[in-house]
Swiss-Prot record:
Lineage: Archaea, Methanobacteriati, Methanobacteriota, Stenosarchaea group, Methanomicrobia
One function term, GO molecular function aspect: structural constituent of ribosome
Record keywords: Ribonucleoprotein, Ribosomal protein
Gene: rpl31e
Pfam families recorded: Ribosomal_L31e (PF01198)
Designated name of the protein: Large ribosomal subunit protein eL31
GO cellular component, one term: cytosolic large ribosomal subunit
CDD domains cross-referenced by the UniProt entry: Ribosomal_L31e
Amino acid sequence: MAEALKEHIYIIPLREVKRAPRWKRGNTAIKDIRAFLVRHMKSEDVKLDKSINEKVWENGSSKPPRKIRVRAMKFEDGQVQAELAEE
């Protein structure tokens, strides 16, 4: 893998997910994380790591976390890869 041009740690709020129906909250959280990274990293090509998915779905679809801490890396080709940031 090439060197990362930009690397940021974001704390992504997922408050708005609670407005979705209970059975859609997990999927909505993943979509919101991807949309946040598209907006802040200025790239449409966003890949989420398996660890982010596991964290969101940890308590099931109806109870995603209120916020999530993510490390995002943007590469030369414009691709953004995101993984769960260690605390």
